[in-house]
Amino acid sequence: MEASRVKPGFNGVGMAAGSVNGSSRRPGPGLGYGYGYYMGSGAAAGGSGRAAQAPVDGCSVALRVFVVASTLVSAVVMGVDRQTRTIQITITDALPPLEVPLTANWSYSSAFVYFVVANAMVCLFSAAALAACRSRAAMVPVMVGDLLALALLYSAVGAAAEFGILGERGNSHVRWAKVCNVYGRFCDRAMAAVIVSLIGAFANLVLLMLNILTIHKSSSYY
């Protein structure tokens, strides 16, 4: 009778061994104790590390580099733009014309100063965003910054272009004479800087649209 109580597979040694083996198999990764628990925590840590890094899109990186380069070139070209010309002023017909050196400088125009500052700020922001392109937590702040940078660039381009057109054509209503016929090189450089900055602003717009599309695709609500 005593021997029948300790049959293998029932309340005896076999059942105890089976229970031990079963307990060692049941705690899966991250669910039980011992080795399975540590493996689970390691996998979770690896998953969290991978989740903290966003996948890098080659097209977005290329656009970001182009925005950095275009805004840097625009700020530098406009920042060094100046030209000095000697203007002949006739006081009376009896006297020879008076030669006066006059200088056109970008710092004389508030629109051009705003243009240089705006492009420099966007260049610095885009460089910082390029350095943080692998951080998933920085996606939304960078997207908001891109939106502000886009508004800043377009406003600066509009202000500089309006002042450039005024120098190219003048304004007959207020009797403002055109000056680009005298300072041709100055106006050409300013217009080149405005065009490059406008192309950079368009690239920033495309980049912002790509970021919005990426967040839309990765959202769990859609």
UniProtKB/Swiss-Prot annotation:
In this protein, the residues bearing a glycan are: 105
Membrane-spanning parts: 60-80, 111-131, 147-167, 190-210
Q: What superkingdom does the record give? A: Eukaryota
| A Pfam match | CASP_dom
Q: Which residues lie on this side of the membrane: Cytoplasmic?
A: 1-59, 132-146, 211-222
Q: Does the keyword Zinc-finger apply?
A: no
Q: Which GO terms describe its cellular component?
A: plasma membrane
Q: Topologically, how does it sit relative to the membrane?
A: Multi-pass membrane protein
> Which keywords describe this protein according to UniProt?
Cell membrane, Glycoprotein, Membrane, Transmembrane, Transmembrane helix
| Cell compartment(s), UniProt | Cell membrane
Could you list which ranges are Extracellular topological domains? 81-110, 168-189
UniProt xrefs under InterPro entries: CASP/CASPL, CASP_dom, CASPL
User: Subunit structure of this entry?
Assistant: Homodimer and heterodimers.
**To which protein family does this belong?**
Belongs to the Casparian strip membrane proteins (CASP) family.
Q: What is this protein called?
A: CASP-like protein 1E1
The scientific name of the source species is Sorghum bicolor (Sorghum)
